[in-house]
Amino acid sequence: GGGGIPVVRTEAGDYQSVDAVIDKDLSTALLAREIHADILVITTGVEKVCIHFGKPQQQVLDRVDIATMTRYMQEGHFPPGSMLPKIIASLTFLEQGGKEVIITTPECLPAALRGETGTHIIKT
């Protein structure tokens, strides 16, 4: 876990920290949208997103479209405070113009960028 440090600009033009909670996944999606990024990368503790996580029928997700990922989310496959915020941020980014989201571990990121691993969420 961990989160961002919220700051506000004071009247003097300085920045001051404030007590608040920053959702780092949604903040990342917002920043990606603002800079007109085509791809959003979210690193996490697993190489690929799974449904039925930790159960005998666990299934890894390689390439998934928005509609399918939305359905999995609505079915409750992603725990709040864990994978759910990442999925919400991913869908938000794609719905607001992004082209692809990659979710993987930092170690697998180079291979994921080559399309060799990670979960790739696309529009269609």
How should these model regions be labeled?
Residues G1-T124:
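C-terminal catalytic "cap/lid" subdomain
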